[in-house]
Amino acid sequence: MEPHVDPTVSLCYKLLSDVARVRHLLSDEDTESLVHSIVSSRLDYGNSLLYGINKCVLQKYQHVQNYAARIISKRSKRQSVSDVLVKLHWLPIEKRIIFKILTFVYKTLNGMAPESFTTLISIRDHDMLLLNNVYLDSSYGRRSFTYTAPRFWNALPFNIRSSVSLEIFKRLTKNYLFNHFSALKSTAFLYQA
């Protein structure tokens, strides 16, 4: 995936440096809107495929997101941007990837995703909206949607899985990932083969 990541990161840095040059001319709201439109779409494009990829490759995306937050908040590179990410309600890259996977599962179960996704997951319990876990031996296979999606989905609380609309699901999932990410991750892979 590095052939995809490196050009994306390079382009984002170039575009963000252009925004940084004119930052003093823009209002905070305009800067946030501009940065969001430039960076988020590029970082989110196909990012669910990045699950399980080498952490140093993911870190490149995280640096881009941090740089974008620094431009919006007018912070120097020595200052932390963790609180800025929370204020902007931006999930860190690793959480964004899991958010995207969970959104695909929700769309698949509710008939909003392409039909090809329906063959990748199967429901184990209709009442509790639980999915069948697939067991794979290879580390490559464990990065697949078929393997990871049921584990993260089943680890979500029932009130999130049973959301009545995509907007509500996204809002609840994002809040849950902000507050309970480590619990979700450990629960999802508790019984990993």
What kind of region is each of these model predictions?
Residues 1-193:
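Hydrophobic/basic alpha-helical segments
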